[in-house]
Amino acid sequence: MIKRLIVISILLIVGTVLCGCMEQENVGQQNSEAQEKIVLKIFHAGSLSVPFEEYEKMFEKEHPNVDVEREPAGSVACVRKIIDLGKKADILASADYSLIPQMMMPKYADWYVMFARNEIVLAYTDKSKYKDEINSTNWYKILQRPDVKIGFSNPNDDPCGYRTQMVLQLAELYYKDPTIYDNLVLKHSNIKVEENNGTYLILVPKELDVDTNKLFVRSKETDLLAPLEAGAFDYLFIYKSVANQHHLKYIELPKEINLGYYEYADTYKKVALKIIAKNKTINAKPIVYGMTVPTNAPHKKEAIEFVKFVLGHPEVLENNGQPAIIPAVAYGNVPEELKDLVKIEK
């Protein structure tokens, strides 16, 4: 009897040890699998949040070993994270393609692809003042009313913000009314304008100071959506794609000023904007999005695969109200994996 008890006890001890070893082995395998998962970091413009969320889910489904992590922000802020703060990203997607050659090349990038278009519209809600009166011909007059508050993103951080300034300066030329930009922005901020022989240079100070009774400003354009819908201000200058994605009402602006059409490039270039903090001058031009894999990207192979995935699924952009450029136009040392999907320009 005693011998049987001893044998049973030994068997129980051995069984417990074996189970423990198996559990540790399983935990070890799970930890190993978790460690092997690649984190693909993407810095992208806020206006790309909706389509890139779709791309993230689609890409992860096809690549279960990859975890896509997105950091939306103003495009200038995205670039600054890389070139000023030393942060590493696998992909940079900007709402203004020119930021890549102007701010990143050649040290932080050696190629880029132009893959989507957009235009600026004036969005509003049922809470906006004079919503039943405003239209595509009187919008600039409605905005000048003293009880109307307008919103735009910070031109120091976000292309949508500096494009808004360009649109309003172009509006003065289009409507032949030199008071529009003055009354809407210049009188209510420390932004200045210099005029020289029919061309205009908008000067944006390092620290933007605005009259909050008239202007509502946040870092990136998508930060303004919730306040607009809550009635914190009345009208928002924003990309048409974002307005469509969030089911906002909006006024379409004339093609001559909305920065959406190549055929008006010569008109747009009458206006430029200088970001004093970076000593960068940006010419008004048609809105084109750009994407690159930074030279110090931790996971270049997977990053190029993601760019290839985006270029191969333009319908995601189109379905979200953002016209895709087909084929995409690429510049620089374009990776071999992308060459069949792009038109390479010198």
UniProtKB/Swiss-Prot annotation:
One GO molecular-function entry: molybdate ion binding
SUPFAM superfamilies recorded: Periplasmic binding protein-like II
PANTHER family to which the protein is assigned, alphabetical: MOLYBDATE-BINDING PERIPLASMIC PROTEIN (PTHR30632), MOLYBDATE_TUNGSTATE-BINDING PROTEIN WTPA (PTHR30632:SF16)
Gene name tied to this protein: wtpA
InterPro entries: ABC_trnspt_W-bd_WtpA, ModA/WtpA
Gene3D superfamilies, per database record: Periplasmic binding protein-like II
Record-given protein name: Molybdate/tungstate-binding protein WtpA
Assigned keywords, A-Z: Cell membrane, Membrane, Metal-binding, Molybdenum, Signal, Transport
Organism: Methanocaldococcus jannaschii (strain ATCC 43067 / DSM 2661 / JAL-1 / JCM 10045 / NBRC 100440)
Gene Ontology cellular component terms for the protein in this record: plasma membrane
Function statement: Part of the ABC transporter complex WtpABC involved in molybdate/tungstate import. Binds tungstate and molybdate.
Topology class, membrane: Peripheral membrane protein
